[in-house]
Structures are given as C-alpha cells and as structure tokens.
Regions:
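Short beta-strand/loop motif that positions the catalytic acidic residue
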Residues: 285-287
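Short beta-strand element of the alpha/beta-hydrolase
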Residues: 109-119
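Gly/Ser-rich "nucleophile elbow"/oxyanion-hole loop immediately N-terminal to the catalytic nucleophile
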Residues: 173-188, 208-209
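Alpha/beta-hydrolase active-site loop
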Residues: 156-176, 340
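Hydrolase active-site cap/lid region
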Residues: 203, 207-263
C-alpha cells in the first residue's frame, strides 16, 4: 500500500507464506457507553467465525437480518424506492440495485451515494442498511442512494463481488439521466467489508479508465483492507471486540480461496496491497481505537497522503467495530455520525458560481 519502503517491508514473502504478525498487545479500553452496551448483550464478544461454523452462521444471519421491501422503505411517502436488475459482469448474473431518493425532487439531478453493505464478504444484504442511510443522509443532504446486492463468499470468491459492484456503478453512471443523479457527484462507500469493496472499487475505476464513472469521494467506515493480519491491532487479544482476528482470517480465506496470502494477490482483492494510491477520490476513513481493523485503516489514510491524495481520518477513542450499531445513542456514535455527514456535505456541495 502506498509507495513507501514501509509498505514493501510488509508484503507477503515470495514463498506465499503469510508473515507472522506481532505478538498480541493490550487493547485500548472501551468507551464506557460501548462497554455497557456489550455487557447488556450478555457477553464481551460473539463467538468467532470459523470455517467449521461459517455455513451455519450464514444461514442464521440470512434468517434474522432485516430485509425491508421496497413498499416498506417507501411507506411513509418521503422516499421514492425502486429495485433494479441491471447487467452484471461478463459471464456473471444480473446485479440487483436498490435505489432510493427523497420524494418530490424529480426536477433536479441529485448527488449519489453508491453503497456496499458490510458482513465480512460472507453475510449481509443490500436492503438492511437502507433505513439508516435514508434517515441519516438521504433526507438531510438531499441525495440519492444505491445499495448493491453483491454475491457473497465462499460461493462467489474474488473477483466476483467486486465485479458485481463495478458493473452496477458503471450502469448507474451511464443511466444518470434516467435515475435523476449527477454523475459528477458520486461517492462510493461502505462499512467494514463494504468499505473494503469501496476502496477496491476506487482503485479499479481509476485503473480501467476510459469513459467510465469518476467517483468524487470514497466513504470508508472501518474498512476491511488487508488479508495478511500483520498489524498490531490485528493481533489484539480476543474478547474485546465484536470482530476478532479469528473471524477476520476466516472471512478472508472464504473470500480469496486458494489465493489467500499469495504474494501476487492483486490490490483489488485487498487494497492494503496497493503500491500506488495516487489519483484516487477524496477519502473519509474511520476506525475505532479498540478494533481489529484500526491499524490497516490508519495506514491506508497515511498512504493516500503520501501519494499526494486527500483523506480525512478519524480514530474514535474507545470504539470497537460496529460501535454505532451496538450503541446508536452513545455520544461517540453521535460524534461519528456528525463527522460523516459534515464530510459528505462539504464534498457534495455544488460548486459556487
């Protein structure tokens, strides 16, 4: 990642064997409100994901995760919501996009948030994230959102999910007039694995070039970027976060298959492998000080700066992975939501005459 010597030292050895990470260190303390929320859930952290329990956990997640219908999302009349099936990648299936925008604004093109859900690349869906996005961003900022239903691992491994996201973005930008969006004001974003896909998508769009979309920004919330697990935060003691090192390793193996840990893994599979982070959209990068993915997110923002790019980095003190969902009323959650919204507002503001 980046062009500095520190990145090359952190690459996987030529043998393909994963470099052993640092010894586990003490974890920063959790924010008191977040610690109380974890305790209220009955345990410090959920059972880690393993290859043995992954299929069962996927079934359980699919059964209980919300999947609101188009009618439910638009029931109060404030939003226009549509479910679209668009051409997928070559030799791949169609991609489902869930599109929403504030009602009554059909007369002018709106900026677009093109969003990829979290779930470790193995869980989640495009519908469950929309109520929060509609409430926090679509109405206050008067923007449109498209949430992507990409294929999940291990049934579909790299590059399938990323190519689904790319195909959907190309279609959306090419149909900006029909969708009522401003193709010059597109932000790609996501949370956790979805943020990792957004970072990979920014690299892919840049490198494929041509007449394709040109995102204005990338919103990376606790991004999952590095398959190598070689950072200090990536080896923190278990039991202090809702996302632990064992689960992280399990989902990377599911997503990459035989390419897991390979020395020649493309940066589009794990953006922390990138050696050129120049000419990328402006980035908002957010991590918690007490989460496994902290160090790779901080390093990614730093590498963007080293490449001459724009990045806004927030390390929320005492925050674990997914803290805003764990404790939606916590002061730290309010601060994080305000910071995200301010960044989007600044980035998407129409140019002054």
């Amino acid at each position: 990642m980046g062009s500095g010597e520190g990145v090359r030292r952190g690459s996987v050895p030529a043998t393909g064997e994963r470099r052993r990470g640092p010894a586990p260190r003490a974890a920063p303390p959790l924010d008191p409100e977040l610690g109380a929320a974890l305790a209220a859930n009955g345990s410090r952290a959920p059972e880690p994901l393993t290859p043995a329990n992954l299929a069962d956990r996927q079934r359980r997640d699919a059964a209980r995760r919300p999947r609101p219908t188009v009618e439910e999302l638009g029931a109060d009349g404030r939003f226009e919501v549509a479910e679209l099936r668009v051409p997928g990648p070559p030799d791949g299936p169609e991609v489902t996009l869930v599109s929403a925008r504030p009602a009554g604004l059909a007369g002018r093109p709106l900026p677009l948030l093109y969003y990829m859900h979290g779930g470790g690349l193995v869980m989640g869906n495009a519908w469950s994230v929309l109520p929060r996005i509609l409430r926090e961003w679509v109405l206050p900022l008067e923007l449109a959102v498209i949430s992507v239903e990409y294929r999940l691992a291990p049934r579909t491994q790299y590059p399938g999910p990323l190519e689904d996201c790319y195909a959907g973005l190309v279609w959306a930008a090419g149909h900006a007039g029909v969708l009522g969006i401003d193709a010059d004001r597109i932000v790609i974003g996501g949370k956790s694995a979805g943020a990792g896909l957004a970072a990979a998508l920014a690299l892919l769009v840049r490198d494929r070039g041509g007449a394709g979309p040109r995102p204005l920004g990338q919103l990376l919330l606790s991004p999952m970027l590095d398959d190598r697990g070689s950072t200090f935060s990536g080896h923190r003691p278990a039991g202090h976060d809702v996302w632990d090192p064992a689960s992280n390793e399990t989902v990377w193996k599911a997503a990459l298959g035989d390419r897991y840990g390979a020395a020649d893994l493309p940066p589009y599979a794990a953006p922390a492998r990138a050696t050129d982070l120049s000419r990328l959209p402006a980035a908002y990068v957010e991590v918690g000080s007490a989460e496994v993915l902290r160090d790779e997110g901080v390093a990614y923002a730093n590498a963007i700066w080293q490449a001459g790019g724009r990045a806004e980095l927030h390390v929320w003190p005492g925050a674990c992975h997914g803290f805003d969902s764990l404790a939606p009323r916590a002061a730290l959650t309010r601060d994080a939501r305000d910071a995200r919204t301010r960044w989007l507002r600044r980035l998407l503001a129409p140019p002054r005459a």
